[in-house]
């Protein structure tokens, strides 16, 4: 394979929510190849956090009005979408807002736990225009990628209002490709990429993350020949095979209780296959995981068909846990 000259990266401008980066020299054509790929990943695949649903005391749907509040619920929902935050929690987190008396309500009035940080505290939410009025609101913060419309969410209980979730922390990316001279050649590329963020991530970190995403996909293709010759299943201690797609399923898919989930995570058990490899004795040896949690795990595995139900026999059950 012919060697490809590695480019250098120069930070032209660096701020909290804006950055310009120059990548050069690139072989002819690679400016647009890299620029377009990085731009697409930056706009769609950088993880972020957003408020996904709200619940306001005395409000049952988004077309309501609130006594003593200048804005109607639809306007409040639109303003809530603009609250930008960092979430360090893997699971949904509840935050709340409680304010009494006339005045402007801003994002700074939101009461959030230590694992959630409001990045734009001066963001306007609504105005209370009566001294005896009160606004009580509960919001759910989740992590995700891209954009999740409210109408693609599962049905919520009456009173909970879904919000279009804008997870992406990168709203805008531009790139320009120019020709530069390298030795006697004048057709090499120089890539200048501009990145705007919402302040929850630095532009340089976003660029690095986007490149890592591209590397992961490219590595899968690069390893194709090696992976195609390897076995597609892993053997459990009981001698039964665990298909690769089941083995690599995240334990989040089991929808376990918070206590059980945290016990497994602290033990560095992150995949369904790891659970299936363990017998009951091994599971019970996990710190703080008791009989009740073990039974919950077994029920979830049965529910999803990973192990057979009692009385059902199969020669291909992948589980190490007996049912």
From Swiss-Prot:
One GO-annotated biological process of the protein: DNA-templated transcription
EC number: 2.7.7.6
A GO CC term assigned to this protein in UniProt: DNA-directed RNA polymerase complex
Region (Alpha C-terminal domain (alpha-CTD)): 243-323
Domain of life: Bacteria
Pfam families listed in its UniProt record: RNA_pol_A_bac, RNA_pol_A_CTD, RNA_pol_L
Region listing for Alpha N-terminal domain (alpha-NTD), in residue ranges: 1-225
Ion transport listed as a keyword: no
Transport keyword on record: no
An example molecular function term from Gene Ontology annotations: DNA binding
Function: DNA-dependent RNA polymerase catalyzes the transcription of DNA into RNA using the four ribonucleoside triphosphates as substrates.
Family statement: Belongs to the RNA polymerase alpha chain family.
Subunit structure: Homodimer. The RNAP catalytic core consists of 2 alpha, 1 beta, 1 beta' and 1 omega subunit. When a sigma factor is associated with the core the holoenzyme is formed, which can initiate transcription.
Domain notes: The N-terminal domain is essential for RNAP assembly and basal transcription, whereas the C-terminal domain is involved in interaction with transcriptional regulators and with upstream promoter elements.
Name of protein: DNA-directed RNA polymerase subunit alpha
Species this protein is from: Roseiflexus castenholzii (strain DSM 13941 / HLO8)
């Amino acid at each position: 394979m012919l060697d490809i000259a590695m480019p250098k990266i120069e930070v032209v401008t660096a701020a909290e929510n804006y950055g310009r980066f120059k990548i050069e020299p690139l072989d002819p054509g690679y400016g647009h190849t890299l620029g377009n790929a990085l731009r697409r990943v930056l706009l769609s695949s950088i993880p972020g956090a957003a408020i996904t649903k709200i619940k306001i005391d005395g409000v049952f749907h988004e077309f309501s009005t609130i006594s003593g509040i200048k804005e109607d619920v639809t306007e409040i929902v639109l303003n809530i979408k603009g609250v930008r935050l960092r979430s360090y929690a893997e699971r949904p987190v509840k935050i709340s807002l409680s304010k009494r008396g006339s005045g402007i309500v801003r994002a700074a009035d939101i009461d959030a736990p230590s694992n959630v940080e409001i990045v734009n505290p001066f963001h306007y939410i609504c105005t209370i225009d009566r001294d005896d009025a009160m606004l009580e609101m509960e919001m759910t913060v989740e992590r995700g990628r891209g954009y999740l419309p409210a109408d693609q969410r599962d049905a919520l209980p009456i009173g909970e209002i879904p919000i279009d979730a804008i997870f992406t922390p990168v709203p805008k990316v531009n790139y320009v490709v120019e020709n530069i001279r390298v030795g006697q050649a004048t057709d090499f590329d120089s890539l200048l990429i501009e990145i705007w963020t919402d302040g929850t991530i630095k532009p340089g970190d976003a660029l690095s993350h986007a490149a890592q995403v591209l590397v992961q996909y490219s590595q899968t293709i690069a390893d194709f020949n090696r992976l195609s010759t390897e076995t597609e299943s892993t053997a459990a201690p009981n001698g039964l095979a665990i298909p690769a797609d089941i083995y690599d399923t995240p334990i989040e898919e089991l929808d376990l209780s918070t206590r059980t989930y945290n016990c497994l995570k602290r033990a560095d058990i992150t995949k369904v296959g790891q659970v299936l490899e363990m017998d009951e004795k091994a599971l019970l040896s996990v710190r703080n995981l008791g009989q009740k949690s073990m039974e919950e795990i077994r029920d979830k595995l049965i529910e999803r068909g990973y192990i057979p139900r009692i009385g059902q026999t199969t020669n291909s059950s992948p589980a190490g846990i007996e049912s």
